[in-house]
A protein has these predicted regions:
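Transmembrane alpha-helices of multi-pass inner-membrane enzymes
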Residues: 32-37, 356-368, 372-394
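Membrane-embedded alpha-helical segments of multi-pass membrane proteins
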Residues: 21-43, 83-94, 166-175, 214-222, ...
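Hydrophobic transmembrane alpha-helices and their immediate junctions
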Residues: 38-40, 122, 193, 226, ...
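Juxtamembrane membrane-water interface segments that cap and precede transmembrane helices
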Residues: 8-12, 146-160, 309-323
Length: 394
């Protein structure tokens, strides 16, 4: 049993780093962990511990609500597929609670988290190096366009065509680790190396040009200036304002991803606003109890067609807002349940770890512009860290 506990400990530790690779890698790790932990998961002592963990119960309930919604959906096939996608919200809490029964050296504590940070940062920079090397090769030896390979989808392409938004989310977390974690390293040039890596991460995030993660990066940097450098509040306010104005002007006038937000008259024309309007229209029509996932896509398609939202129709856009997505799925009661879940997660981070607190804060912002909990790369990321926060031993 001791050997199995060691194996599961390390598999659980490397799981978030597997998100930089093809999604089958993380899915395989979760499946192996579940098979290893089955004998422990369904023991009475484990289930008794689970009942005391509100965050884990909320996660499992999220899966069960989708399962119950299958009874009311017209499109069973799509509903079953969505249930398969969110399986991590059921499986990872069941895996996670078993670590509560481990001996102290194999529990989820600060030693575990420190190892996780080392692995995540190392794999993250391997991913950055791979993307930059691929871009350099394509531009200089493959007759590729610099505007494509050093930018957005082209830059993220070698990581099994991961969507740049999700890569940027992971790098936001990596940036938080670099800035706020106290590294126990005795390297001679430790601080120089650290700041070179921070600068490289910021440059890479700018090249990726994922807008919401750039906003989050800016907030993380401001919080670092305030918390770690102990800057006077007036100086901080002036610095923040200066950086904000400079950043906005630089990005809007030099980056196509930001230029396309406005038309020639300077009026906002972002298609995401049209998507939100359509999603809100669907949510308003099913305000109290929502509409099952299997039927939501059809309803959104009808609204997009009615509102002439061509891009949303062609690309089958979801709500692009997790709060709206939940309102559409389960109505106002489902949204209130979701907010309560997030409250418990955030409250747990206040007492245990600043970096986790930043992570949850970042996720709350991501939810405003993406339906992260509808995509595998986002589902595993969120279900893993919500579980980790719940089982973390101070």
């Amino acid at each position: 049993m001791s050997k199995i506990n060691h194996i599961s400990y390390w598999l659980f530790l490397v799981l978030p780093s597997a998100l930089f690779f093809e999604k089958i890698v993380a899915s395989t790790l979760i499946a192996v962990l579940f098979l290893i932990k089955i004998p422990i998961i369904f023991q009475f002592k484990t289930l008794k511990l689970l009942i005391k963990q509100k965050i884990l119960l909320f996660s499992i309930l999220y899966f069960l609500l989708h399962a119950i919604a299958l009874l009311f959906t017209i499109d069973i096939e799509d509903g079953l597929y969505s249930l398969e996608i969110i399986l991590s919200f059921l499986v990872l809490p069941l895996i996670g609670i078993t670590f509560k029964r481990n001996n102290k050296p194999l529990q989820i504590n600060r030693h575990f988290v420190e190892k996780l940070f080392y692995v995540f940062v190392s794999v993250g920079f391997l991913a950055i190096a791979l993307c930059l090397c691929n871009a350099f090769y394509k531009v200089n030896f493959g007759n590729g366009s610099k505007d494509y390979w050093f930018f957005y989808r082209g830059l993220a392409h070698p990581l099994w065509q991961i969507h740049p938004i999700y890569l940027a989310y992971y790098l936001n977390f990596l940036l938080s680790i670099l800035l706020f974690h106290d590294w126990n390293l005795k390297w001679k040039f430790r601080e120089y190396i650290k700041w070179i890596l921070i600068l490289l991460t910021i440059i890479f995030l700018i090249l990726l040009s994922a807008r919401t993660p750039l906003v989050v990066s800016f907030i993380i940097l401001i919080l670092f200036i305030y918390h770690r450098l102990k800057v006077h509040k007036v100086a901080l306010a002036l610095t923040t304002l200066s950086l904000l104005i400079t950043s906005v002007l630089a990005l809007v006038f030099t980056n196509n991803r930001f230029k396309e937000l406005f038309n020639e008259n300077g009026i906002l024309q972002e298609d995401r606003v049209q998507t939100w309007r359509g999603a809100y229209e669907v949510a308003s029509d099913h305000f109290w109890f929502g509409i099952p996932k299997g039927d939501l896509d059809d309803e959104l398609e009808k609204v997009y067609r009615k509102n002439n939202h061509t891009k949303g129709l062609e690309r089958s856009y979801n709500c692009h807002n997790q709060y709206l997505q939940l309102l559409c799925y389960f109505g106002i009661f489902g949204l209130l349940y979701f907010i309560l879940w997030l409250y418990y997660v955030y409250r747990a981070t206040i007492d245990n770890h600043l970096i986790f607190q930043l992570l949850v804060f970042s996720i709350l912002i991501y939810f405003c512009t993406e339906s992260i909990m509808s995509v595998n790369k986002g589902i595993v990321f969120i279900s893993y860290f919500f579980t980790l926060i719940a089982i973390y031993e101070k």
